Amino acid sequence: MTRLLGIIRIRGYAGTPWYIQDTLKMLRLPRRFNAMVYEDSSSIRGMLKIAEPYITWGELNEEGLKLLLTRLHTKIGNLKITDDILKSQLKIESYNLFVKKIMDGEIKLHKLDDYFKLPIRLHPPSGGFKGKINRPFSVKGEFGYRGEKINELIKRMV
C-alpha cells in the first residue's frame, strides 16, 4: 500500500514569485482551493518544499480519499462518478474498488485527466481556517505539512 499525499492550495497568485508559480503549475494547482492526490516520492516532496507557503498537505486515509472523489466530475457531460461511469470508462466494477485501487497504487489519480476534470475543486473550509494562512501549521497557522489532519480539512472543504 503506497502513501498518498493530499495537496491543497490555500493562497492565491498575487505577489507569488515565478518559481513558486511554476511549481504550482507542475503540481496542477492553478487556483485557490484546488486539490490533487499524488503518491509520496522524493520529487513530489521537493516540489512541496518549494511551494510550501502556498499549500498544505498530508497523508490521506481511505475516508479522506472517498470525500475528495465525491467532488470529481467526468470530462464529458460533467457527471459525478457512479458505478456505471466507472464500468464504461475504466472497466472497474464499483466505486469502492476504484478507491481501493487508488489506495494500493494500481491507479494514479493524477493520470486520469482523460476521463475526469482535474484538479479537484473544493469549497472554502466551513467555519473558516483555524489559523492564519501565512503561518506554518506547526505554529498555529495553516500552510505546510499537517499529516493526518489533512483529512479533517478535506471533510470541512467538501
Curated annotation (Swiss-Prot):
GO terms for biological process: maturation of LSU-rRNA from tricistronic rRNA transcript (SSU-rRNA, 5.8S rRNA, LSU-rRNA); translation. The keyword Ribosomal protein applies. Keywords: Ribonucleoprotein, Ribosomal protein. GO terms for molecular function: RNA binding; structural constituent of ribosome. It holds the Pfam family Ribosomal_L30. InterPro entries: Ribo_uL30_ferredoxin-like_sf, Ribosomal_uL30, Ribosomal_uL30_arc, Ribosomal_uL30_euk_arc, Ribosomal_uL30_ferredoxin-like. Signal peptide: none annotated. The keyword Ribonucleoprotein applies. One of its GO terms (cellular component) is cytosolic large ribosomal subunit. It comes from the Archaea. CDD domains: Ribosomal_L7_archeal_euk. Part of the 50S ribosomal subunit. HAMAP family: Ribosomal_uL30_A. Belongs to the universal ribosomal protein uL30 family. This is Large ribosomal subunit protein uL30. It comes from Sulfurisphaera tokodaii (strain DSM 16993 / JCM 10545 / NBRC 100140 / 7) (Sulfolobus tokodaii).
